[in-house]
């Protein structure tokens, strides 16, 4: 897994934040827009990287594809 791939996925979630009062993101829905097949290991590894590095966190109400953008994640997408 390349760090660049994970960061493309993170930046692709930016659209999902517009007009929402929450920081809920669903990377699975925007993976293809980032050039990542959401059914491949590369996607899973990218999400794991974003979780491990603190860019996203599991959504408080457990769900398979829902995550919450952290402050670190917001700073990254707003700076790039």
Short names for language-model regions:
Residues 36-52:
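Short amphipathic alpha-helical interaction segments
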Residues 71-80:
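Short, amphipathic alpha-helical interaction segments positioned at domain boundaries
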Residues 25, 42-45, 68:
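Alpha-helix N-cap and coil->helix boundary residues
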Residues 19-34:
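Short acidic, hydrophobic short linear motifs in intrinsically disordered regions
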Residues 1-21:
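Short alpha-helical segments that sit at the start of domains
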Residues 51-61:
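A short, conserved structural fragment
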Residues 63-69:
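Minor-groove-contacting beta-hairpin "wing" of winged helix-turn-helix DNA-binding domains
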Residues 1-5, 42, 65:
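N-terminal positioning helix adjacent to the helix-turn-helix/winged-helix DNA-binding module
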């Amino acid at each position: 897994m390349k760090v660049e791939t994970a960061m493309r996925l993170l930046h692709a979630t930016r659209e999902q934040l517009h007009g929402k009062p929450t920081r809920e993101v669903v990377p699975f829905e925007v993976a293809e827009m980032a050039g990542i097949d959401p059914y491949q290991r590369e996607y899973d590894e990218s999400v794991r990287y974003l979780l491990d590095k603190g860019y996203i966190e599991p959504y408080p109400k457990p769900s398979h594809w829902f995550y919450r953008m952290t402050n670190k994640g917001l700073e990254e997408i707003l700076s790039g």
